[in-house]
Each structure stands twice: as C-alpha cells, then as structure tokens.
Amino acid sequence: GGGTSRERVLEIMKDSHIGTYGVLGLVVNYLLQWNVLTALMQALPGGAMLSVVADPLCKMASSSIVHFLPYARKASEAKIKMVYTRPSWRENAACLAFGLLPAASFFSMSYILPFVMACVAALCLFAIMRRRIQGYTGDCCGASFIITETVFYLTLCLLQYA
C-alpha cells in the first residue's frame, strides 16, 4: 500500500488522518498483543512484570534508528527537534541504562532470544525504511517500537509453548 515514490510515501505519512491500513494494522497488533500477553501471564510466574522488562528493552532497540538512518525529511519539516538530532554520548548512556536496568533487575535467560529477535526485527524495519524513504520519520520511530515489542512478546510466547 501507500505511495510508489519516496515523496508520495512521505506525503502520506505527513497526513494526520488514519487510513484503512493504519486501522487494520493497529487492530491486528493490539489483538495479537492482548492474546500473547494473556497467554504469557498464565504461563510465566510474575508474568505481570513482563512489560516492565519488554517496554524499555524494545524502546532501547527501536531508538537506535538514529544511528542507522538519517532523518528522511528536511529538518525544518520536523515537528520535534529531538526526532532528527543524533543523541549525545550521555543520552546514549542513559538510553542503555534505562533500557537494560529493568531487564537486569528481573533477569531471566528466557528474555535473551526475544530481545535478539526484537533487535533483528528493528534492523529489518530499518532496511525497509532505508529502501522506501532513505531515512526515518517520527512515524517510523513509533512503528518500530510497536513492532519490536510485539516480536519480543511473540518470541517469548513461542518459547513458552514450544
């Protein structure tokens, strides 16, 4: 779906109205997350703490987008300066700390493969973004977080029920 050219894709992404693909993607993702999280809460002791680990880990993985891709729009078109500015070493250190600290607090070996798969998903998304729009936008940042989090939960669920 969407546009065939980079310019058309960016134009569609700038439109604040949600389309059929957006609605369908959100509904399918939330239904999938609901079912996977429900299954994990029943299968894992302390399953309620899972989002305390998964959320920061996946935000850390998806935030690495700024290290792999340039901002796709002109800086003057960005709504938030933070989106197109590369983080400093202090901000990177904070991102790592806030991403890894909860995982270290509730460490389980069963989180390693899901985290690796979430990182692989993020890298695949970055490759698609590079090919389609030669960079990223704020929408891309949000989508990469949602997808990496879903991949984390799905992988963990598959490991529990395999």
Label the predicted regions.
Residues G1-T20:
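Aspartate-rich (DDxxD/NDxxD/DxxxD) Mg2+/diphosphate-binding motifs
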Residues S5, Y21-A162:
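Hydrophobic alpha-helical transmembrane segments
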